[in-house]
C-alpha cells in the first residue's frame, strides 16, 4: 500500500475493466493487491543463462494434460506409460497413502470419490471465499477447505494439499513421460495457462512447475500456443480467432499472423466455464429424472454420484458423433424395495437444450474481443477451435453463426496447446527461428485512491512485457519508510513507482525516491499464495513422492521377475521330472516356498531384496536343469551308439 497520510491512501488493485462495475471487485483482477501484498527484495535479476537440454511444452489442462517436444522443426506429442497422448489431470490418494496420477487415479474414482481430485485447476490461485470456489464446493465429492492463508485447498485422509501441489503431481507425470521418451532428465519447460488467468493464478501455476522440479522458462496463454501450432508452417498473412473451450475455462483471442510474427490483438474469456460445467448440468438432469422416476435422491450418495458423473461425461462425448445415446447404470443404488437401476435414453437435442445457456455464455466475450481488437467478423480469415468441448456440433454451429464462417479443424483440439508450448520452448532455446510471439495482458492494472477513484495505468490487451511509471506523494506516517524513505512533511517525498508486467503476465513493481535516488524492487504477491517456505516444503514432499514412486516401481518389477522365475521353474520341473533327482527337486521346491513367503510380504520388502532372492532361485534352478540336460544328452548318446552298432551288424550280414 502506498499511503499519502492517515486521511489519504492509494492502494494497488487490478480489475477486469471489461466486467460490470458490480463485478469489478479487487479479487476479480490482480486478486486484491494491498499493503500485505508487497514483498521487498534487494534486487531483480533479469539475467538468463543459456538454456541447456530439451525444453518440453506442457498443456496443464483442467480435464486432461498433454506434453510435447520439438524434433527438428516439428513438435511431437508424447505418449504416456499407458500409451495415451493425453493424461487425465486426476490425482488420488488411497487409504494406505499411495498416490495415483492420471488414468490409474481416474479408474478408481468411483470407489474412492472423497480422495480423488479432479478439475483442481479451477481452484488454483483462488481464495476460498471466491463465489466460484463456493459454487464448486457443492459440486465435487472431495473436500475444499480454507487454508491458513485464506486460499482454497483440498483435503484427503486428513492432509491438506494446495491446488499447486495437485498440479505439480500432474506435471511430474508429464515430466516423467518426456524423460522416458528423451532418455535423459527434462528440466526446462514452457507451461500454458488460460489467457484470462490473473496474476495470482499465473504465479500459482509457476509454483506448481517449481514444486514438480521443473524450471519454468515461460508461462504462455493457451490460445496463443494454439495459434503457434496452427500458424508455424503458414506463409500467408491473416487475422485469426482462437476459440478455446476446454475442460474448465473459456478463452477467445484475436491474433494477427504476419511473416512469423504472432501478435495478439485482444483476449477475453471466462475462467469458470468449460466441460466440467457441461458435465455438471447433465448430471443434475440425470439425478432429477432418476428421482422423478424412482423417488430416490442420489445427491447424498457420493459413490453413486461419481458413477453418474462418469456416465454423463461419456454420454456428452458420444453425442458429439451420435444423435442418441443410452445411459445404463445397473445397481446404481437401492432402497427398501430393492436395487435401483438407471436406464435412460438421451438425444443430442435434449443435451443441447440442457447446456444451451453455457454455450451462450461464450458469445459476449467473443464480441468484446472483436471490439477490443477493432476487427469485424469479415476481417477474420480463420477461426481455430481448441479444447475438447469444441467437438460438440452445437458449439461449432454457434462459432459459425458468431464469426460468419465455418471454423477450421486444422489442429487437434486436445494437442494443439501442448504443441504450441513446445514451439515456444524451441524459440526460447534458439532451435526455432523466425518466430516472434507478442502476447497481451488480459486485465487492467491501476491505482485506486481514497474515494474510489480508479486510475488505469496499464490497460487490458496491452502487449507484454510492458511497464508504466507513476509518481505519488508520501506523507509522514507511511509504510514506505520500510524502503528507506526518510520522514518528511506530507507531500514532500515523491516516489516514482514503476509497474512492470513481464512476459509471463506476472506483475513486478519498483519504487524510487526522486529526492534521494534510493530505489527498491518490489515483487507483488497476493495476500494469499504460497510462501517461499511453503514451496520448499512442497518440493521436498514431491521429491519424497518421487522416491516412493521409484521404490514402488522397482518393487513391482522385482515381483514380476520373481513370479516369472517361479512359473518357469515349476513348468520345467514338471516337464523334466523323470530326469531330475528327487532330493534336488525337493530342495528347489523349498526355495520356491521361501520365495512365495517373501512375495506374500512384498509391501514391506525392498525391490533389491526380492530381486536378489529371485536371482538365487534362478541360479539354483539353472544348476538343476543343467544336470537334467546332461543326463538327457548322455542317454541320447547311449541310445545313438547302440543304434549305430546294430546298423553295422546288419550291413555285415547283408555282405555275407
From Swiss-Prot:
Biased composition (Basic and acidic residues): 646-656
Coiled-coil boundaries: none
Organism domain of life: Eukaryota
Transit peptide residue numbers: 1-46
Segments of this protein annotated with the region Interdomain linker: 432-441
One GO term of the biological process aspect: negative regulation of erythrocyte differentiation
InterPro entries noted in UniProt: ATPase_NBD (IPR043129), Chaperone_DnaK (IPR012725), Heat_shock_70_CS (IPR018181), HSP70_C_sf (IPR029048), HSP70_peptide-bd_sf (IPR029047), Hsp_70_fam (IPR013126)
Stretches for region Interaction with FXN and ISCU: 432-656
Region (Substrate-binding domain (SBD)): 442-656
Record EC number: 3.6.4.10
Subunit structure: Interacts strongly with the intermediate form of FXN and weakly with its mature form. Interacts with HSCB. Associates with the mitochondrial contact site and cristae organizing system (MICOS) complex, composed of at least MICOS10/MIC10, CHCHD3/MIC19, CHCHD6/MIC25, APOOL/MIC27, IMMT/MIC60, APOO/MIC23/MIC26 and QIL1/MIC13. This complex was also known under the names MINOS or MitOS complex. The MICOS complex associates with mitochondrial outer membrane proteins SAMM50, MTX1, MTX2 and DNAJC11, mitochondrial inner membrane protein TMEM11 and with HSPA9.
Domain remark in the UniProt entry: The N-terminal nucleotide binding domain (NBD) is responsible for binding and hydrolyzing ATP. The C-terminal substrate-binding domain (SBD) binds to the client/substrate proteins. The two domains are allosterically coupled so that, when ATP is bound to the NBD, the SBD binds relatively weakly to clients. When ADP is bound in the NBD, a conformational change enhances the affinity of the SBD for client proteins.
Family stated for the protein in its record: Belongs to the heat shock protein 70 family.
Name of the protein in its database record: Stress-70 protein, mitochondrial
Source organism (scientific name): Mesocricetus auratus
Amino acid at each position: 500500500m502506498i499511503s499519502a497520510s492517515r486521511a489519504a491512501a492509494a492502494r494497488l488493485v487490478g480489475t477486469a475493466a471489461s466486467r460490470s462495475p458490480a463485478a469489478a471487485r479487487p479479487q476479480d483482477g490482480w486478486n486484491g493487491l494491498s499493503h500485505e501484498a508487497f514483498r521487498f527484495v534487494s534486487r531483480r535479476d533479469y539475467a538468463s543463462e543459456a538454456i541447456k537440454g530439451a525444453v518440453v511444452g506442457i498443456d496443464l489442462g483442467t480435464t486432461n494434460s498433454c506434453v510435447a517436444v520439438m524434433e527438428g522443426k516439428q513438435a511431437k506429442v508424447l505418449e504416456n506409460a499407458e500409451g495415451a497422448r493425453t493424461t487425465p489431470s486426476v490425482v488420488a490418494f488411497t487409504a494406505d497413502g499411495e498416490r495415483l496420477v492420471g488414468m490409474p487415479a481416474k479408474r478408481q474414482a468411483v470407489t474412492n470419490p472423497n480422495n480423488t481430485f479432479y478439475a483442481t485447476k479451477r481452484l488454483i490461485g483462488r481464495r476460498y471465499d471466491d463465489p466460484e470456489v463456493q459454487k464448486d464446493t457443492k459440486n465435487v465429492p472431495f473436500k475444499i477447505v480454507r487454508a491458513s492463508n485464506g486460499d482454497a485447498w483440498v483435503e484427503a485422509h486428513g492432509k491438506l494439499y494446495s491446488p499447486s501441489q495437485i498440479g505439480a503431481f500432474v506435471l511430474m507425470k508429464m515430466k516423467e513421460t518426456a524423460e522416458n521418451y528423451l532418455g535423459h532428465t527434462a528440466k526446462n519447460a514452457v507451461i500454458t495457462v488460460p489467457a484470462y488467468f490473473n496474476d495470482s493464478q499465473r504465479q500459482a501455476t509457476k509454483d506448481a512447475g517449481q514444486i514438480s522440479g521443473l524450471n519454468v522458462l515461460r508461462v504462455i496463454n493457451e490460445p496463443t500456443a494454439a495459434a503457434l501450432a496452427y500458424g508455424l508452417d503458414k506463409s500467408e498473412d491473416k487475422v485469426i480467432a482462437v476459440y478455446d473451450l476446454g475442460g474448465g475455462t473459456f478463452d477467445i483471442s484475436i491474433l494477427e499472423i504476419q511473416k512469423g510474427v504472432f501478435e495478439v490483438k485482444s483476449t477475453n474469456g471466462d475462467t469458470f466455464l468449460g466441460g466440467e460445467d457441461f458435465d455438471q448440468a447433465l448430471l443434475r438432469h440425470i439425478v432429477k429424472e432418476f428421482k422423478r422416476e424412482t423417488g430416490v435422491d442420489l445427491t447424498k450418495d457420493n459413490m453413486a454420484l461419481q458413477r453418474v458423473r462418469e456416465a454423463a461425461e461419456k454420454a456428452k462425448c458420444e453425442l458429439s458423433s451420435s444423435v442418441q445415446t443410452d445411459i445404463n447404470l445397473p445397481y446404481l443404488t437401492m432402497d427398501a424395495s430393492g436395487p435401483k437401476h438407471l436406464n435412460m435414453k438421451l438425444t443430442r437435442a435434449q443435451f443441447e437444450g440442457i447446456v444451451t445457456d453455457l454455450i451462450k455464455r461464450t458469445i459476449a466475450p467473443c464480441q468484446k474481443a472483436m471490439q477490443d481488437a477493432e476487427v469485424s467478423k469479415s476481417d477474420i480469415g480463420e477461426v481455430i477451435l481448441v479444447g475438447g468441448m469444441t467437438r460438440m456440433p452445437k458449439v461449432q454451429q454457434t462459432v459459425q453463426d458468431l464469426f460468419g464462417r465455418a471454423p477450421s479443424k486444422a489442429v487437434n483440439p486436445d494437442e494443439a496447446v501442448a504443441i504450441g508450448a513446445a514451439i515456444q520452448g524451441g524459440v526460447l532455446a534458439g532451435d526455432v527461428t523466425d518466430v516472434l510471439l507478442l502476447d497481451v495482458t488480459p486485465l487492467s492494472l491501476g491505482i485506486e485512491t481514497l474515494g474510489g477513484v480508479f486510475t488505469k495505468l496499464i490497460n487490458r490487451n496491452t502487449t507484454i512485457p510492458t511497464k508504466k511509471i507513476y509518481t505519488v506523494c508520501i506523507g509522514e506516517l507511511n509504510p514506505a519508510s520500510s524502503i528507506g524513505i526518510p520522514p518528511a512533511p506530507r507531500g514532500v517525498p515523491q516516489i516514482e513507482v514503476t509497474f512492470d508486467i513481464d512476459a509471463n503476465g506476472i506483475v513486478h513493481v519498483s519504487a524510487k525516491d526522486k529526492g534521494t535516488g534510493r530505489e527498491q524492487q518490489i515483487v507483488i504477491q497476493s495476500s494469499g499464495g504460497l510462501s517461499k517456505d511453503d514451496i520448499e516444503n512442497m518440493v521436498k514432499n514431491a521429491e519424497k513422492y518421487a522416491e516412493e514412486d521409484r521404490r514402488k516401481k522397482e518393487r513391482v518389477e522385482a515381483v514380476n521377475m520373481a513370479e516369472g522365475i517361479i512359473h518357469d521353474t515349476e513348468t520345467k520341473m514338471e516337464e523334466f521330472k523323470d530326469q531330475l533327482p528327487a532330493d534336488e527337486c525337493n530342495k528347489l521346491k523349498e526355495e520356491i516356498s521361501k520365495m512365495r513367503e517373501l512375495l506374500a510380504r512384498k509391501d514391506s520388502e525392498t525391490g533389491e531384496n526380492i530381486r536378489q532372492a529371485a536371482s538365487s532361485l534362478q541360479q539354483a534352478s539353472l544348476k538343476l536343469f543343467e544336470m537334467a540336460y546332461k543326463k538327457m544328452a548322455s542317454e541320447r548318446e547311449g541310445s545313438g551308439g547302440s543304434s549305430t552298432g546294430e546298423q553295422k551288424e546288419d550291413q555285415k550280414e547283408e555282405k555275407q
